[in-house]
A protein has these predicted regions:
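N-terminal Rossmann-like FAD-binding beta1-loop-alpha1 element of flavoenzymes
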Residues: 2-29
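Short, flexible helix/strand-to-coil boundary loops that buttress conserved ligand/catalytic motifs
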Residues: 40, 44, 148, 242-243
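Active-site/ligand-binding neighborhood in enzyme catalytic cores
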Residues: 87-92, 97-228, 232, 236-239
Length: 291
């Protein structure tokens, strides 16, 4: 039997703790925040499950993973279909035939592919060396300027030319009229929120949980007292920033409660212009179909 310390009660930490406990190991989970579930933490407010740290849509291509999470919660059939708002113009995401039709009036995939190919020509066959060039190589200049450039620069706080190309290596582009953001066959959101999943994972006699507990307050003591430590926090902090600090993208969340039945008609609306001082608005009730 191994005596484990798991630092962080998010999805990874909880899954590890659950599986280790099933195998007879003792697991102590500590969490710096005042709640479990990490960034997938959901909280019910006026009957609505609010994703406290931004939208999380569960999706996977593997049936065994889908079956695994369905042990802990029933999932609805929610399909992620965000939209983009650029100065009041609404576009479908991921970039697909609906987007191309709105932008250029094209109807067939052949017309759309031809339009993008024409716009890629500005690169003169050059291998993309930054995010801007990578985006243009994938979707052309029009979509890049309206739906990628300013949104990305708001997200990262950097000029797109200064960002590496791999950030949008997998920018989804579809030559169909399908608004489903993901290709995975299994997708949904747990009815009643994500927090219950982590609660059930950690409900085991071999698991103890402490919240409001910072690993770094007693790091040396923890490392001495446990056989093995599973650390899910910032890796540069764990090593005392010996190689310097990694750059992390941070987010600020602002919450409003409005007395309206339906504010924006969609769960997620991205604002892709630089003048709007935020990246997106999330209306959480739509994750469970308006309930």
């Amino acid at each position: 039997m191994t005596n484990y310390l798991v630092v962080g009660a998010g999805l990874f930490g909880a899954t590890f703790a659950h599986e280790a406990a099933k195998r007879g190991h003792k697991v102590h989970v500590i969490e710096k925040r005042d709640h479990i579930a990490g960034n997938i933490y959901t909280k019910e407010i006026d009957g609505i499950q609010v994703h406290q740290y931004g939208a999380h849509i569960f999706h996977t291509s593997k049936k065994e993973i889908w079956d695994y999470v369905n042990q802990f919660a029933e999932f609805n059939r929610y399909t992620n279909s965000p939209i983009a708002n650029f100065h009041g113009e609404i576009y479908n995401m991921p970039f697909n035939m609906n987007t191309f039709n709105k932008l250029w009036g094209v109807i067939t995939p052949e017309e759309a592919e031809k339009k993008i190919e024409e716009q890629r020509a500005v690169l003169n066959g050059k291998r993309p060396e930054n995010l801007e060039e990578q985006a243009i190589s994938l979707v052309g200049t029009d979509i890049y300027k309206k739906l990628v450039k300013e949104y990305t620069e708001k997200q990262w706080g950097r000029d797109a030319k200064e960002l590496p190309p791999f950030i949008i290596k997998r920018l989804p582009v579809r030559f169909t009229y399908d608004n489903n953001y993901f290709n995975d066959p299994y997708q949904g959101i747990p009815i009643g929120g994500y927090t219950q999943i982590v609660e059930k994972m950690l409900d085991d006699d071999n698991i103890t949980v402490e919240t409001n507990t910072d690993f770094f307050d007693k790091k040396d003591e923890y490392l001495k007292d446990y056989d093995k430590v599973v650390f899910t926090g910032m890796i540069d902090q764990f090593f005392d920033y010996k190689l310097g600090e990694l750059e992390y993208r941070s987010l600020r969340f602002e919450t409003e409660e409005l007395d309206v039945d339906n504010y924006q008609g969609n769960a997620v609306v991205n604002y892709t212009d630089k003048e709007t001082p935020y990246t997106r608005i999330i209306e959480h009730k739509h994750f469970e179909f308006g309930k």
